[in-house]
Structure formats: C-alpha cells, structure tokens
C-alpha cells in the first residue's frame, strides 16, 4: 500500500451547496440544533424546511442534533431524531415514516479511500426505510 499524500487530495468535484447557504446554516445549526437549551422541536422542523429539507408531520427533533446539510435531508411522518444524533449528510439522507434514530446515532455518508495515495472522498446516500 502506498503512503497517503494529503497535499494531492482534491475534492473540487464535490459541491454540497453555495458558500453563503452553508455559512448561514452553520450558525442556525449551532444556535438552534446543537444548543441543548433549545428543546423546541417545532422551531427546528420549520428551520429545516426553510433550508430545503423535506420534513413530514409529527417529526420530533431532540436537543443537540447535528445536521450537516438540511437541503440533502428527507424525514418521513412521525419520525424521531434523538439527542446527540449526528447526520453527516454529504449526500442525500432519507429517513422513512415512523423511524426512531436513537440517541448518539451517527449517519455518515462519506469516507475516504485510504488505499489511494490521494485519499479520495467517497460519498453514498443513506436510505432508512419506514419503521
């Protein structure tokens, strides 16, 4: 196996959204989602929709949830996202109806090809079917 050469890493092909949108989401995520003092799920659901997420009815989002890009997220009706969940959705994540993503779960859409010296980014969507 060849050594990794981080200086040769290139993910210029990966475009998860505009820089301004990502920056705005960063602050909204910190203030309303990662903040343990905001227990109000309804506000979080509205903010997710505002940023392009498709969110069904009766969705409950607990405190300290980290979502990378809401515009790449779909949550079905009556699903729950538990405390300390990290949705690192570099590409589309689809969560079905009546699904519970329990406390501390991590949904990771990306990794790196450690077998290549260029450490290429690998991304694949996640689909969690109806509960």
Q: What name fits each language-model region?
A:
Residues 56-58:
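N-terminal signal-anchor transmembrane helix
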Residues 38-45, 65-75, 80-131:
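Flexible, glycine/small-residue-enriched loop-and-beta-strand segment within the central core
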Residues 1-53:
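Terminal amphipathic alpha-helical/low-complexity segments used for targeting or macromolecular assembly
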């Amino acid at each position: 196996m060849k050594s990794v050469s981080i200086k040769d890493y290139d993910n210029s092909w990966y475009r998860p959204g505009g820089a301004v949108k990502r920056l705005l989401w960063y602050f909204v995520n910190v203030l309303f989602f990662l903040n343990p003092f905001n227990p109000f799920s309804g506000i979080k659901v509205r903010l997710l929709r505002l940023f392009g997420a498709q969110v069904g009815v009766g969705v409950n989002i607990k405190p300290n949830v980290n979502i990378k890009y809401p515009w790449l997220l779909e949550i079905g009706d009556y699903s729950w996202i538990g405390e300390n969940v990290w949705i690192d959705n570099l590409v589309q994540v689809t969560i079905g109806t009546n699904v519970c993503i329990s406390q501390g779960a991590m949904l990771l859409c990306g990794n790196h090809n450690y077998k290549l010296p260029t450490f290429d980014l690998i991304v694949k969507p996640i689909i969690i079917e109806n509960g």
